[in-house]
Amino acid sequence: QFAMKVPGIEAIYTWEDVPQERFTMAGQTYPELSPYDRQILDQHVRYVGDPVAIVAGENEKCVDQALKMLRVEYEVLPANLDPRKAMDKDTPLVHPEDNWKALCNIGADNKKNLCATEETHEGDVDAVLADCDVVVEHTYHTKANQQAMMETFRTYCFIDEYGRLNVVSSTQIVFHVRRILSNALCIPKSKIRVSKPRIGGGFGAKQSSISEVYPAFVTWMTKKPSKIIFSREESQIASSPRHEMQVTVRVGANKNGKIRAIDVYTLSNTGAYG
């Protein structure tokens, strides 16, 4: 209530003010392979930087002042930080909610901390490896990688003369963003128009919806124009990096060097959301 009294503040929203439907921010063709595991704002935050409120005001100065006046009380829950232990019996669930859903049958199971799982094989690899003269096995680790495009995430929204929500965004996926916003805001796609000007780089980072949902919600609620511009740090925190991987490879060969079998097991640290 103190933050709302800051001159120029238009609105402050928390998880109680937004639709409770879950959606995915992944820029994928419908039905998406990524699970519907996000909300615009969620009571259960899952990483440092997960949004807890939307503050809208006339200028950046008043918004920054209001942000400093917000007080958030956190109940600290047991963390799940090691992907190698993520499926253990007593490991905390990242998504315990009942309205989590996966549209495609790709082995996703939120009650097991699984975003996806798949197995494919040709022949009996274990039997062939057991019959090989030489078997080499090694486990490799790759770190998470994050893009650093010149232009950070940013979105501008307004309501046009037809009552449509217009979204102008630095994105690579205008039609996917339209569907994502429709799911997040619970409004028809026909009420949304997404435009993409020339963008200052993406490299795949802008193939997910990152910044669009927050000003879109503000504009849809207030019917006033809004925009958001992420800082470099915010862009690094909020977007989806290439996942950390643990890859175990077994290669079997004859003494003459002919490779007879290859077995690969990959564990991907997907993180807080799919």
Q: Across the structure, where does each feature detected by a protein language model lie?
A:
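Gly/Pro-rich active-site capping loops and adjacent beta-alpha segments
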Residues: 20, 35, 62-88, 115-119, ...
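Alpha-helical support elements that line or immediately flank enzyme active sites
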Residues: 1-15, 53-74, 155-222, 268
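Helix-loop-helix junctions that connect adjacent transmembrane helices in secondary transporters/permeases
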Residues: 94-185
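Flexible, low-hydrophobicity surface segments
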Residues: 1-107, 135-138
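Short, solvent-exposed polar/charged micro-motifs at secondary-structure junctions
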Residues: 21-26, 86-91, 145-150, 202-206, ...
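Glycine-rich and small/hydrophobic secondary-structure elements
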Residues: 32-63, 203-255
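General beta-strand structural signal in soluble alpha/beta enzymes
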Residues: 11-16, 47, 136-140, 167-169, ...
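Short acidic loop-to-helix transition motifs that present clustered carboxylates
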Residues: 17-21, 142, 174-175, 199-200, ...
